[in-house]
Amino acid sequence: MTHHRKVRSALTVTALLSTAVLVLTGCTTSTPAPTTGAKGPDLAAAKSFLAPWLATTDKKLLIDQPLSGSIPAGTRIAFLDVGTPVAAVMWDILQPIVKLTGIKLDRVSTGSDAQSINTAMNTVVESKYDGIINITLDPIFFKPQLQQLIANKVPIASGSVMDTVENGMPEAFNGPDWMKSEGQALAASAVVRTNGKVNDFVLYTIPEFPFAQFQVDGFKSKLKDLCPACNLRVVDIPIATLGSTSADQVVSDLQAHPETGYYVAIADEGTVGLPAKLNLAGITVKGLGTWSIPPNLQQVAGGTQDATLPIDFNLMMWTVTDQLFREILHDKYKWPDAQTRAYTLATLLTKDNAGNYPNGYAAIPDMQKQFAALWHVGG
């Protein structure tokens, strides 16, 4: 796939450059501007598409069959930590699983450059783990070690990795089609939040994340369906700026493009602190994001950020771990369709309901109890 190769290429270059180079000004692409008198967004269609994401009941675990047996005593698992704020959140989410199941979980810091990843993955191979949890780390960075892990029959359960099957790994539940569905939901959310009255949008993406381009593609396709005449700019925000200067880059971009009516961020963590900066700059443009962390939800609950389409990180990490347990036990399983997987883990939150989730969105309130039953633990 052309887009996938482009993203891989960008990620490879990024890994070889210094952090200073990564902070260079992001690139911008745009779709044609709307013609005078063109019809605006189809609000009814946007609401209809988004309906499954907004459901507050009937969301179920993606796999609901019990494990074929107990998790082997002494099971050792490595968590690959890529060093982002979200990765830190996901590590914390795994701790109750350790307590519940008794597994041994090691945190392996991979870094973000080729050399550090190579060193970390060599250690993983030498440590002879029973399984690996990988969130976002592209296999292109550890091909030799991956081949050794596969040869040693060490299963790898992945989250937000786009080419698992192609690289001989179990299929990630949130692969390319899942990401496209999330991108479509973001576009529909933007139309809904602007009440179908905005025609100029900007989408901030992280080019170093292999999954981001699939979300961009989904966003573009759905926005074109909902509003063929709308104008969309796609702006790159370097991964190295997340948590530091990413919000400043958004401010600068909006200052340079006063025609923009609404923004959407693929990595919402990059907009933490943005509302105050926008206010200081006298910018009134509102927006939403996804892959949101608790500070984003706090901004939404406080009314300073318009909305968010958060992913249930708890459900995501427990699902990835559940998959790994099934791989370790050689259990057969099948994922539901991509859109079902997508809307199960996400919803649209606004000031009216974001305060209900101070620690992050929870799609299935009794999720831990349900997983414990599937794993034959905890009671």
What is the meaning of each model-derived region?
Residues 36-74, 317-379:
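Hinge/cleft segment of the Venus flytrap/periplasmic-binding protein
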Residues 34-66, 70-93, 106-118, 123, ...:
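Extracytoplasmic "Venus flytrap"
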Residues 76-79, 94-96, 184-227, 232-236, ...:
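An alpha-beta-alpha
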Residues 62-64, 173-201, 213-214, 246-247, ...:
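Hydrophobic alpha-helical segments within soluble ligand-binding/sensing domains
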Residues 132-151, 219, 239-299:
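Hydrophobic alpha-helical
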Residues 24-36:
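Bacterial lipoprotein signal-peptidase II cleavage site
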